[in-house]
Structures are given as structure tokens and as C-alpha cells.
């Protein structure tokens, strides 16, 4: 399952999953372009993976996001995939007390950034002939509780956007898929808390493995799928 010579953009690469996903794709021979709010952690992740392009981008700025996509194509001549790892969570009030401000924050973080990145990259992914789009989504996007209504609604909207992308890609050679996970455990978390029971968590390594598979030609027939990993509710 080689990704040799292919170019992948990773949005939100400085977050929880970034280091593991970057390492996995780099190990398969991919050329990577990393974006996030802060460049310093991206530079560290890139160095650990043997090199990658890094840039600080405000993904809420649609034009800045398009400029990032254009820059990748100018540098590498192509872009073959977008892995959207932008995420975040904070506690919410019960549904009757949930504020519109809470919803707006989740919408900006989880929907607007995703809309901007996909709209910036879709023309290039179609030109690739085998473009890929992936997001990571929690199981409870499809089974929300009253205390995470705004978060779950935003994630469900991101899933719907992905399925709409899959429809756009039908018959083009490009694909869009969703990796469904539970609470995530990273190698760093295991090092920091080695005695904690992570049996019900989704390992970051398995998420990265699923993403690498979906990036490959082996997954060319998978489009509009929810790939559920262990730990997903």
C-alpha cells in the first residue's frame, strides 16, 4: 500500500491526531503539506516525520485557505488528498440551556473550516483523478446526548457535507469518506498515563492506518462510507 509520490494536505495537523497521521502517511512515501493555527508545532511534527511543508493558515478565511491550496499545487504540481483533522470539544449545558454562541463556536470550528478547505481543494482533487477527502468523526454524531447537542449537530453536519462530496465525486475517481472513532488515545497519552485503562478508546495508530488505507488505490471503490473503528459508540 504505497503512497509514493502522492501529495496530501493535512488541515489541523498540529492537533491530537496530527503527529500519528503525518508519520503514517510519510512512512508510505507521501509528500505532505501541513496547516494549522500555529506553525511551530507543525515544524516539529514535520521534522519528526522526515520533512513536510508547513504553514499557518486561518481556515475560517476562505481566501487564505484557497491560497494554501494553490501554493501546494504551485510547489508540487498536484494535490491528491485532503485529510481534515480540525477538531475540538468543550463541555456544553443541557439542551434546554445550550447557548447559540456555543453552537456558533462549534459551527465555525467543525463546519466552516471544513467547507472552506473542501471548496478550496475539490477542483485540484478532481484534476488528480484519484483525489481523496477524509474526516474523523465521533460515533455519537449519529447518537447524540442532550449534553453534547451542539457538538454532535456540528459533527453530523460535517458528515453530511462529506456524503455530499462523495456524491460530487461519483464516477470521477475521487472519493470522500468518514472515519468513525470513539475517545482517542495517542502514544503520548499512554506515556503520560501508562496505568490508565484505554481498552474502550480508539488508538490514534488505528485511525492513521485507516486514513492511509483510504488514501490508497486499494480503497478506490470506497466512496461515501463511514468506516467504524473499535471504540466508536
Model-derived segments and spans:
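Conserved glycine-rich cofactor-binding loop
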Residues: 14-15
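Catalytic loop of short-chain dehydrogenase/reductase
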Residues: 106, 126, 132-171, 183
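Amphipathic alpha-helical dimer-interface segment in Rossmann-like NAD(P)H-dependent oxidoreductases
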Residues: 70, 109-127, 166-167, 216
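C-terminal helical subdomain
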Residues: 171, 178-179, 195-233
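Conserved mid-core segment of classical short-chain dehydrogenase/reductases
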Residues: 66, 87-104, 147-150, 190
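Active-site loop of short-chain dehydrogenase/reductase
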Residues: 6, 78-80, 125-139, 171-175, ...
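Rossmann-fold cofactor-recognition segment
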Residues: 48-63
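Catalytic Tyr-X3-Lys loop
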Residues: 96-115, 134, 158
Amino acid at each position: 500500500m504505497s503512497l509514493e509520490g502522492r501529495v496530501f494536505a493535512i488541515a489541523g495537523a498540529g492537533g491530537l491526531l496530527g503527529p500519528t497521521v503525518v508519520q503514517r502517511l510519510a512512512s508510505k512515501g507521501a509528500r505532505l503539506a501541513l496547516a494549522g493555527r500555529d506553525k511551530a508545532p507543525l515544524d516539529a511534527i514535520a521534522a519528526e516525520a522526515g520533512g513536510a511543508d508547513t504553514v499557518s493558515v486561518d481556515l475560517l478565511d476562505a481566501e487564505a485557505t484557497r491560497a494554501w491550496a494553490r501554493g501546494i499545487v504551485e510547489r508540487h504540481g498536484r494535490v491528491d488528498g485532503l485529510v481534515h483533522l480540525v477538531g475540538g470539544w468543550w463541555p456544553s449545558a443541557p439542551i434546554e440551556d445550550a447557548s447559540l454562541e456555543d453552537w456558533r463556536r462549534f459551527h465555525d470550528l467543525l463546519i466552516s473550516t471544513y467547507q472552506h478547505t473542501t471548496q478550496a481543494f475539490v477542483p485540484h482533487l478532481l484534476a488528480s483523478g484519484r483525489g481523496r477527502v477524509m474526516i474523523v468523526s465521533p460515533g455519537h454524531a449519529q447518537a447524540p446526548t442532550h449534553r453534547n447537542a451542539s457538538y454532535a449537530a456540528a459533527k453530523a453536519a460535517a458528515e453530511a457535507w462529506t456524503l455530499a462530496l462523495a456524491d460530487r465525486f461519483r464516477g470521477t475517481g475521487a472519493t470522500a469518506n468518514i472515519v468513525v472513532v470513539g475517545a482517542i488515545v495517542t502514544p503520548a497519552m499512554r506515556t503520560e498515563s501508562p496505568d490508565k485503562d484505554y481498552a474502550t478508546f480508539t488508538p490514534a495508530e488505528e485511525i492513521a492506518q485507516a486514513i492511509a488505507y483510504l488514501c490508497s488505490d486499494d480503497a478506490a471503490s470506497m466512496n461515501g462510507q463511514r468506516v467504524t473503528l473499535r471504540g466508536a459508540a
